[in-house]
């Protein structure tokens, strides 16, 4: 996979303010505010910044946390995991492997078959429904 390397100014020009704040500045959207939190359509969720396929809707589940949750990415190679010690916590941040967009965090409290919960900001995603 070819890395996408843009300046913050280039990202700011192509993203809306909320997308820029979360994807490029590692912000977080308010819980239960994202458009995909309750989404049930069948399809594939892509990175809003670079269009890399990230999650299949078949791996989406309702975790009750307020953000779209998935138990696995389409490919492990699509994600980079980074130790995050911000806000006095120890968590695992997940970023897009192609463009380094901040997506959210992964936690070890998800359902089978993986036991993982990828807690992802809606604003980082673009759902492409299956026909």
Curated annotation (Swiss-Prot):
EC number: 1.8.4.12
One Gene Ontology MF term: peptide-methionine (R)-S-oxide reductase activity
Amino-acid positions noted as binding Zn(2+) in the UniProt annotation, renumbered to this chain: 47, 50, 96, 99
Annotated GO CC locations: cytoplasm
Active site: 119 (nucleophile)
EC top class named in words: oxidoreductase
GO BP terms: protein repair; response to oxidative stress
Gene3D superfamilies: Peptide methionine sulfoxide reductase (2.170.150.20)
Cofactor(s) listed: Zn(2+)
Domain MsrB: 8-130
Domain of life (superkingdom): Bacteria
Cystine pairings recorded for this chain: none
Reaction catalysed by this enzyme: L-methionyl-[protein] + [thioredoxin]-disulfide + H2O = L-methionyl-(R)-S-oxide-[protein] + [thioredoxin]-dithiol
UniProt cofactor note: Binds 1 zinc ion per subunit. The zinc ion is important for the structural integrity of the protein.
UniProt keyword annotations, A-Z: Metal-binding, Oxidoreductase, Zinc
UniProt key word Thylakoid: no
UniProt xrefs under Pfam families: SelR
HAMAP family xref list: MsrB (MF_01400)
Assigned protein family: Belongs to the MsrB Met sulfoxide reductase family.
Name assigned to this protein: Peptide methionine sulfoxide reductase MsrB
Organism in which the protein naturally occurs: Pseudomonas entomophila (strain L48)
